[in-house]
Amino acid sequence: MQYERTLSTVWDDLLESLDSETRDLLDVLAFLNPDCISEDLLRGKPDTTSGNLTVNNSFRLTVMLSSLIRRNLLERNITTTCPSLRMHRLLQLTLLLNLDRRQEKRQEAFDNAVRLTRDALPRRDMTSRLPQFDAIWKQHMPQVLSLQAAFEQSNLSIAAGFEFASLLADAGSFLWEHRLNRIAIPLLTLGEKIVVAQLQEGETHSVLASIENFLAVLSAYDSVEDRRLAMQRLKRVVQLREGILRSLPDKTATLEQQIDLGRAWNDLAYIHADTEEFEEADQGTAKALELYKSLGDERSLRFRFAIQYQSIAAVRFGQGRLTEALDLSRRSYELCKSELGPRHLETARMEVEWSYVLIGAGDLHGALDRLMDALAVRSERLERDNPAILNTKYWIGTVYHYLDQLEEAEEYLRQAIEFGADSDLGKPDLARSQYRLALLLYEQRRWKEAVTFEEAALSSISDEEQATIFCDGDGRDKRKDITMEVLDRRVFLQNGRSTGPFRGERTGKV
């Protein structure tokens, strides 16, 4: 209490000198990221900050901001590329503490902050990915995270509805595309909680289906056990999507609503492919493709066909139908590149997944070219410890290992594990990379170091699985192969596999 009183004393005189409109604006800003509030965000749609402030009265907004800057309640960022403001964190805390004592004002300010942010951010359309919106999402993502924190940390509950949940769902989608899973999952979990609280028993809503879908896919990276839960969640998503379409009058479903159902079928099918249930995977991917063909073609729905071809390619790869898998992977990459351009993250993902099939076909140099291209794109767009970059480096190191270029292989494999558990790289992926490096070190007779990495990798699997390896493995080399296959199968299929049904026609090292 003494701390709160001290903070209030610092700012009270200045706050009391503000007119009501300017104070309302400051309360809204308190829910946003204090380090960088874009002025473009404030000049959004009419009536988003108070009853009198509108985009048509830009001059009035300028006057209010000037007043706040003059009183040192805000300051301009001079280092940012676009006009933005900064608020002292102690002032932000004071404003939020004051709002916690004024429930009606707090709710109004929060709703307006949500509306400002929602209006500034383009809605994520799963029909395609529009690359021109990426910069906008990246610029304003801190505001979404600030709203999430304010909502969760408020002393009193804040009401939130579908608009905020939809914003969280879209943010989760963007973060997943950038493989920022640790940030995305709490956002989506909060969105799910908000939507469920709004729905009556038996009710469905598209926002809930979207959130469930993203949570299922995100959780699939963590462990085999989580992928089993993801399969159950995706079955619910299919039911939700089918229920939404059934509830609509005939021929009134939008293109996106129908595509959302196809996505749900496809994502569930992909999890079946991950667990090597290829018959179910084949049925689900075919069902989604048939739906897309009824809605458009490769020209009108290029992105969705690209995604679908890549999913079917993974199934064909696992079925041993390599010629089909290679053709589908190539078409997937080309469609994605023509839709989004060669430097988009989704294009890079299609290129990496194409490389998995090339490895299975024994075209190691072709795979290496694809992986190097994708690494260049990902390194340009993502941080060094991003799991997409680390996974690409694992595969580059693995291809070099297959080519007996051990020095290059070691370099990339060490880079793949250098951040360890501190990155978003899933535990199964880290263990696989550690064991691949151990195999390389064993080849070089660097026993002590090899054992260290081998033990680290084996610590990620259960005693029962380790016992199975030693029972089935007749001889040291056989045990190494079985261990690599066990660790490889624990990795989510989207991150690639090179053993079991996904070994393909390649011969030589496991």
Which residues does each predicted region cover?
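Amphipathic helix/helix-loop-helix segment enriched in hydrophobic residues with interspersed Lys/Arg
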Residues: M1-Q2, R43
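C-terminal boundary/linker of central alpha/beta nucleotide-binding cores
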Residues: W11-Q103, Q107-P122
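Extended alpha-helical scaffolding segments used for macromolecular assembly and cargo binding
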Residues: S20-E21, V28, D111-L190, I194
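Helix N-cap/loop-to-helix boundary motif
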Residues: D134, I158-F162, L199-A209, D226-R228, ...
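TPR-repeat structural position
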Residues: W137, N181, E225-R227, F278, ...
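Amphipathic alpha-helical segments of tetratricopeptide repeats
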Residues: Q148-A149, E192-Q200, K235-D250, A286-D297, ...
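Conserved alpha-helical positions within TPR/SEL1-like repeat arrays
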Residues: S166-E177, S206-S223, E256-D274, S300-G318, ...
